[in-house]
């Protein structure tokens, strides 16, 4: 096996124009899952935040494949978080020279993908490697898959 420098790849989004609660609703469903499982879940979710988060996961996967020799089927989401940002404040012009304030909620999104094959030191047969990857993936998720 080739020695990889980093088992993790990142995707960041700052000032994402959606409230943190709406983005957390989607992020909580994909945290700790494999890359392929995440794509299926995000394609089927009916929320507005699902498509941009799907793009961020794909960006992180392409970062992983370009910076190291990791395969997409060995990736899983090790960290996914949403942080609030102060609201963007605007004024909407109204009739008779008045204006109403508008607050647009925004958030920061961070997604980290980890390569499971990085933790194997010896070369194993393909069937054994798949079984070992599955066992390691299940051990890393543990009993709770939320956080």
UniProtKB/Swiss-Prot annotation:
Compartment list: Plastid
Claim: Transmembrane helix is one of the keywords in the record: no
Gene Ontology CC terms: large ribosomal subunit; plastid
MF annotations from Gene Ontology: rRNA binding; structural constituent of ribosome
Pfam families: Ribosomal_L22
Annotated disulfide bonds: none
InterPro entries (UniProt xref): Ribosomal_uL22, Ribosomal_uL22_bac/chlpt-type, Ribosomal_uL22_bac/org-type, Ribosomal_uL22_CS, Ribosomal_uL22_sf
Family per similarity comment: Belongs to the universal ribosomal protein uL22 family.
Function of the molecule: This protein binds specifically to 23S rRNA.
Gene: rpl22
HAMAP family associated with the record: Ribosomal_uL22_B
PANTHER family: CHLOROPLAST 50S RIBOSOMAL PROTEIN L22-RELATED, LARGE RIBOSOMAL SUBUNIT PROTEIN UL22M
Keywords: Plastid, Ribonucleoprotein, Ribosomal protein, RNA-binding, rRNA-binding
Name listed for the protein in its UniProt record: Large ribosomal subunit protein uL22c
Subunit details: Part of the 50S ribosomal subunit.
A biological process term (GO) from this entry: translation
Signal peptide: none
Domain of life: Eukaryota
Main location class: plastid
